[in-house]
Amino acid sequence: MSSHITLIKTNTNNENQMTQFNYKVDNDVMIIRAMVNNVAKQITPVWPLEKFIACNSLHGFESMSFEEAVIQNQTAKKGTPFNEKLERVNWHMIKWCGSFLDIGQGTLEMPHRDKGLYFGFLKLAPFDSELHQNNKSTKSWLSNLPEMPEQAIRLCLNKLGVLNQKQEKFLKSTLSHLPGWAGYIKWISEWKNRNGKEENPVSLADFLAVRLIITCVLWPEASQEEKKKKKDNAYTKQLIQNIKNKEDDYRQLLLNKLLPELDKVQIKENRANAQMVFCIDVRSEPFRRCIEKLGHYETLGFAGFFGLPVSIKDYDGETIKDSCPVLLKPRFNIHEKAIAANEHCIEHHEKGKEFKNILNRIYQQLKYNFSTPFALVESLGIWCGITMFLKSCSPIFARRLTKDLNEMICPSIQTQPVFELDLLEKEVGISLQEQIAYAEMALRLMGLTDNFAKLVIFCGHGSSTQNNPYASALDCGACGGNQGGKNAQLLASILNKIIVRRALAENGINIPQDTLFYGAQHDTTTDEVEIYHSNVSQFIHQDILDQLRTDLNIAKHNNNLERINYLNSIDCAEKDIARRSTDWSETRPEWGLARNAAFIVAPRQLTKNINLEGRCFLHSYDWSQDKDGALLETILTAPMVVAQWINTQYLFSTIDNVAYGSGSKITHNVAGKIGVMQGNASDLMHGLPLQSVMSHDDKSFHEPQRLLTLVYAPREIISELVEKHDVLKTLFFNEWVHLVAIDPRSHLFYKLEKTNTWSVIQ
């Protein structure tokens, strides 16, 4: 079914001359595209391992209430009955997806990848004897498929006998069989490929077309066997009620802790020796408590990308990483350069790096070649055996030995960001006006506009683990699953510029001349904090800096003692935590963001004297400096949304680790360097591993509950912002997030109900 459209173009130079264009529009293609777009809305994007981002497993159902979405998806139900034909279809689909989406793990590359998944399948399927079983009619049918995936979808729906009114539902069911692979393809088409450029283009239409073709061949009666699945609503409703009970208990406990602290919020403190700005990550909270107890230090909370939407090219790396939230698109390209302290050291580093790259290329070529792997094993076997023995029996020693050898070959050097706008290559760097604008916005958002300390440390965070496909899940989510130290160093460098400070002073932010900014990084696995070299001066306030480094080591020890209680270790705290960061057999190097429960937007004075047990995201905020609510608007629509993604991923990975988690790490296989499978052919697992949320097989460590957001600000400001943004109305009124306002004047707690009314919490 098609239509003709005639377009007439008038020549502006001569109105009597017209050019006529005839276009043929295939209505079926448009209808199928519309259906695919509709069913795609309920698929959650799945990020690759290298930038593993937390996301709500039921993101596509947020238009429903939380309870309706959970019941509809039957989170707690048993698996569907085994269907051999369905499993065969899945197996073939996994084979094609794995081959097409592979990013360097496979020895041979799938032909025609640059033309798309469907095109490649179209050309290769007639040669797949496992699919057509050398049946002549099937092989002929595969050889004469239409060129467009939408046309193939229509052909298959008709061949399978799916009624028109049931086609969209059937497509939803088709996608639901492998939501992990479908979610990864959705990420490629909607998140990775925002600028329209992709080497190997793929879409959910491609995925559905290939899947339906395989279904026609292997499971032609699929539409007749698609039955309404029996729902265990009683079990699910009881599960939801248990979650609600935990939420009520935790909310009351937290509010009781906060109540005595409300009178302390307006107390102004004297100038601190040092201020440390940490990421809002829940793992920062216990460390902040530890360092605040050791001296005249003040800590603040801010999103760990420090307000800078940048892409960063590492000094030693060839890849460029987007170091900002996935909700944002990087605006600036930054690279690093070595600090020219020792030219001989830099030269040694460059030669060593080249030597290591050559060795790595040779090793990779030998390892993935058809004929050389056995020879490689024979020649390197004894050395690999020794390495395996050391890494297994003494991981700390093995790590230290590896580090020393690397230092001998390629000594580490200090680097600094290069961020000044390149007049010859304007795509690199940040203009002065934008440096000033982003620096001002960052300071205002973190509530640091006066009373600056002598030292201000912006502290990003990352983790250190071995043999861990989910390493990026432990790094900074606000930096797109990367480590945040470079963003911290970049903001510090900008704020150390005199011209930037003068411009900020004109806008009401007066930074004292004796204030120095430093970048740093907090290792959340070991609690080590590295303060980066400053290019301004290494002698000003050296006594304060030395004392701070000493106190940071003490804080590390104290926080290790607190954390070890949750890790069920009988060893010395620091020794065991150091081992976890270096042991390649360790399935739980740290707990990550497990037990996260609340997002608190308030001055630090409100929470400073409370042990929040590492369960709260803490964002600094002073409502008295934000009369129009613009800063709060940014906080609620960006970092709070990211916190909700994290919270729901942990929630669903806990209550159903099979459906929404990724199962045990013990049986993980990395697939194509993009994700993990259970065994050698499964769906692409898209949640957190069992070891990230469960202390034992049958006992959860994470407490599944929805995010509780507490905002220290007048209700009228909050209400205006909620009414202004659909995302906030969706999250609050559909009860994906609970919102409590703390009135700064009356000190009363108010809960926002799903009816858009406020009720006092007694």
UniProtKB/Swiss-Prot annotation:
It is found in: Cell inner membrane. Keywords: Cell inner membrane, Cell membrane, Membrane, Metal-binding, Transport, Zinc. One of its GO terms (cellular component) is plasma membrane. The keyword DNA-binding does not apply. Zn(2+) binds at residues 279, 281, 461, 476. Its main location: membrane. GO terms for molecular function: zinc ion binding. Its cofactor is Zn(2+). It comes from the Bacteria. It is a peripheral membrane protein. Part of an energy-coupled inorganic carbon pump. Belongs to the inorganic carbon transporter (TC 9.A.2) DabA family. Forms a complex with DabB. PANTHER family: INORGANIC CARBON TRANSPORTER SUBUNIT DABA-RELATED, UPF0753 PROTEIN AQ_863. This is Probable inorganic carbon transporter subunit DabA. It comes from Legionella pneumophila (strain Corby). The gene is dabA.
